[in-house]
């Protein structure tokens, strides 16, 4: 897998950088694993906007992904690597020995024809799923469960992986991609290796239209709005926001304020907090 750069034939291709899709082996998805999904466009059940700047975009069909890997001891053959419009990672189509077909997140390095298996006695190979108690120290894992049997909830984006740091008692210490070190129950399942398509972080959309194709609408800065639309709005010309710090459209502190509760019960499982990120690195902008 590699990335593809374009010559400046048009303004949209001047800065466009995409993955070359060379790892995709089949264009059509498995029909038995595809369902229609209503797009919420950032609205809740009452039609109220709960997530701004969402809407439009290309039509999609949802691929049903197996995050549980609960067919223990049944070997599966990787039949194809598919594209998924709902995520940055690729999907691996598995044909199990009993005839069942399932999608999983395609781990890095997994090839068509390779055999993967899940279970406590699975071999230590890339793509196999097993309890964290069976994973060797220092190994990279992804699609990690927070609660046993609920399915992988952490470390699922393209190129992501967590590292097994230590084992003590009923818990395993994991170093997450955010550098946070967290305790997870040893019976929780995880998949060996990192998620594929790691070059996704080096891509660039190149133009605003490609962002619209993904269902992302334009973001307007609060400082150019009217005061009735945003606390930063109003004034003559490029006026300052007139506050001690930036706020959201609803007047809540923004850009740097910690929103995690101090007495959150799961704080006892966080051994080391994630590193502090600067405004530039996290892509902060005027709300």
UniProtKB/Swiss-Prot annotation:
A Pfam family of this chain: Ribosomal_L2_C
Ribonucleoprotein among keywords: yes
SUPFAM superfamilies membership: Nucleic acid-binding proteins, Translation proteins SH3-like domain
GO biological process: translation
Name assigned to this protein: Large ribosomal subunit protein uL2
Function: One of the primary rRNA binding proteins. Required for association of the 30S and 50S subunits to form the 70S ribosome, for tRNA binding and peptide bond formation. It has been suggested to have peptidyltransferase activity; this is somewhat controversial. Makes several contacts with the 16S rRNA in the 70S ribosome.
Family: Belongs to the universal ribosomal protein uL2 family.
